[in-house]
Swiss-Prot record:
Extra remark: Present with 468 molecules/cell in log phase SD medium.
Domain of life the protein comes from: Eukaryota
Location of the protein in the cell: Endosome
GO biological process: endosome organization; regulation of protein localization
The name this protein goes by in its record: Biogenesis of lysosome-related organelles complex 1 subunit BLS1
Quaternary assembly: Component of the biogenesis of lysosome-related organelles complex-1 (BLOC-1) composed of at least BLI1, BLS1, CNL1, KXD1, SNN1 and VAB2.
Cellular component GO terms, alphabetical: BLOC-1 complex; endosome
Function: Component of the biogenesis of lysosome-related organelles complex-1 (BLOC-1), a complex involved in endosomal cargo sorting.
Organism name: Saccharomyces cerevisiae (strain ATCC 204508 / S288c) (Baker's yeast)
Keywords: Endosome, Phosphoprotein, Transport
Protein family (similarity comment): Belongs to the BLOC1S1 family.
Length: 122
């Protein structure tokens, strides 16, 4: 009897889920066994470690990161803000004064041009 490709594929499809289900069943049996096996002890230790990591170490890490972030970023920015805030109002005043000086210079230039024009016309 010759096997065709489609027959082989069908056999694999039919047989593989059964093996997968069997492996899952055996793994559950080992892990959930009422008898303390090495696998169940290891699983229990992993679960305990995961709980410790999430409840203790992760909180400490987040707190450490927050403190580090505050010291490296937030505190220097607050310091610069407090240091240079008084100058911000001063720079606005300088800008207004520069605009007034520029306007006065244009008025003086126009006045000078009008005086020169009147002199030349006489």
């Amino acid at each position: 009897m010759f096997l065709t490709f489609s027959m082989c594929v069908n056999w694999i499809i039919v047989k593989m889920p059964n093996r997968s289900e069997e492996l899952d069943r055996l793994l559950d049996k080992i892990i959930n066994s009422p008898h303390r096996t090495e696998a169940s002890k290891t699983l229990q230790e992993i679960e305990n470690n995961q709980s410790y990591i999430l409840n203790v170490q992760l909180k400490k890490l987040l707190r450490l990161h927050d403190d580090s972030f505050k010291n490296k970023c937030v505190s220097p920015i607050n310091y610069m803000l407090e240091k240079y805030t008084p100058y911000m109002g001063h720079t606005e005043a300088l800008q207004k004064e520069a605009e007034l000086v520029d306007r006065d210079l244009r008025i003086l230039e126009m006045t000078y041009q009008l005086i020169e024009k009147n002199r030349n016309s006489k």
